[in-house]
């Protein structure tokens, strides 16, 4: 059984993330969306909120489950028996960074393969940072995130629509 992991902070989760998740789920038997708990980082959403939002958004995909981890990805992968890392690429700058990380992970565990998926054209510009920037000013984020998350995101900035 091929178990893959799509790791990230997903703060907040976007249509770009969903695009990668849906496409990744077609190439592995089981896909774990691994939500990183980085206590050194100030997240907009708590770990529990991020996990909950991803579960909501991926409920229609039977071979996807959501987990969370802190520390090294390669250590978490051993725990869940995953051998494939899925990474989404938006631009050349993403590739340069992700290639270095993939090589470092391969040194840690040579059985790990990293698969790069280019983002769909509709989402090649999209990031959680962009969502937060627009939301913080009350901008329209309906093209960036699922409808059911919009009010939750605005609420973090004390904004109502």
UniProtKB/Swiss-Prot annotation:
Homohexamer. It holds the Pfam family CTP_transf_like. Its EC number is 2.7.7.3. ATP binds at residues 9-10, 17, 88-90, 98, 123-129. The record marks 17 as: Transition state stabilizer. It comes from the Bacteria. InterPro entries: Cyt_trans-like (IPR004821), PPAT (IPR001980), Rossmann-like_a/b/a_fold (IPR014729). Keywords: ATP-binding, Coenzyme A biosynthesis, Cytoplasm, Magnesium, Nucleotide-binding, Nucleotidyltransferase, Transferase. The keyword Iron does not apply. This is Phosphopantetheine adenylyltransferase. PANTHER family: PHOSPHOPANTETHEINE ADENYLYLTRANSFERASE (PTHR21342:SF1). The lineage of its organism: Bacteria, Bacillati, Bacillota, Clostridia, Lachnospirales. It comes from Agathobacter rectalis (strain ATCC 33656 / DSM 3377 / JCM 17463 / KCTC 5835 / VPI 0990). Its cofactor is Mg(2+).
């Amino acid at each position: 059984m091929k178990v893959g992991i799509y790791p990230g902070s997903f703060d907040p989760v976007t249509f770009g993330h969903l695009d990668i998740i849906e496409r990744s789920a077609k190439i592995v038997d089981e896909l774990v969306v691994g939500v990183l708990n980085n206590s050194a980082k100030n997240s907009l959403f708590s770990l529990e909120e991020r996990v909950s939002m991803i579960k909501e958004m991926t409920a229609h995909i039977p071979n996807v489950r959501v987990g969370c981890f802190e520390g090294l990805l390669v250590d978490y992968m051993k725990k869940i028996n995953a051998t494939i890392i899925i990474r989404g690429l938006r631009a050349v700058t993403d590739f340069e960074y992700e290639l270095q990380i993939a090589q470092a992970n391969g040194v840690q565990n040579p059985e790990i393969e990293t698969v790069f998926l280019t983002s769909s054209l509709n989402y090649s510009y999209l990031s959680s940072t962009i969502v937060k920037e627009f939301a913080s000013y009350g901008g329209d984020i309906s093209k960036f995130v699922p409808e059911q998350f919009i009010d939750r995101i605005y609420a973090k900035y004390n904004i109502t629509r």
